Amino acid sequence: MAAHLSRRALTGAMTGLILAGCASQGPQHPAARTSPPPHLRSRGASDAPSLRPASADLSAPVAFSYTDSDDETSDCIFYAAGDAPVGLVVYLDGDGHPFHNQGGQSSAERSGGGLAGDGGVVEAAGARGYDVVSVRSPGDEGIWWVDDQDGKVRYLEEALDYVAVECGANTERVWLVGYSGGSEFISQWFFPAYAERMAGGGFILFGGGDAPEEEGAAAFSGDAKERLSLNWVTGTRDVPGNSVDRFDGFGHARNSLNYYRAAGFRHTWSEWPDDDHDSITEQFGRYVGRVLDDAASEK
């Protein structure tokens, strides 16, 4: 059996994304916030969305930089579903951001599945009325799960506030979708910090995840445990024997699932297909669509 490419070694040069403003439109609905939070208002954010892709070409993503209140800067790519989004899918890529970096490519150049390829996250989410934003990890290393986790949690929280205010995203339902290192960051650090702010949605983790490292991280409210849906999809062949750096995506995913079930979350689901760390990326859209459909049917 051929060994995997190392997920830690993925680097991928950043594709030349054109930083573009979004065309100004009429009132967006529904907006999760009626006014910007203080950290945005103090920097001149308006009450009405000033950014959103023109509805004439929703297939064209919009790339922009965001700098947080601690002067950390990174880039985001926003894919609009339409003028009345039902929620927001937040995608965090693996090490080197191989799929995030394809945002500036034509559809023919993108690999299948992943974030924005055929059968990918954007296709599945957009078909169900969800905007999608992919956020690159701040910091020179470009990896979500290493260094200054508190700073990265703050950065992502503020970036999502910015997307809600300036792009008119609806954050009443937020789905955190991660791959590999992005899944680790969501399950270990971001979700424990952000869950109480999520009115609906949950997370979908591909190719890994893990249990939070800090004791006491399971201080979730009973309401959060009832309203949020937590989902794991990792291949049974995503194991150390298939990875040049001995990464155990399957083991990490199961650790994460066991932790959140023990913490008392009532809506957990997992599937372990016959895939490895690479081939699972071709299934992203299929599983994202399935989770979103199941959540819609339970409302």
Predicted regions and their residues:
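The feature captures the conserved acid-bearing segment of alpha/beta-hydrolase catalytic domains
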Residues: 201-283, 287-289
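Cap/lid segment of the alpha/beta-hydrolase catalytic domain
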Residues: 126-151
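N-terminal secretory signal peptides
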Residues: 1-5, 12-20
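Alpha-helical scaffolding within the catalytic cores
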Residues: 111-123, 159, 187, 191, ...
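Alpha/beta-hydrolase active-site loop
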Residues: 145-167
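Short beta-strand element of the alpha/beta-hydrolase
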Residues: 85-104
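A domain-start/cap signature at the N-terminus of enzymes
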Residues: 2, 22-88, 189, 193, ...
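Primarily recognizes the serine-hydrolase "nucleophile elbow" in alpha/beta-hydrolase
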Residues: 165-166, 172-224
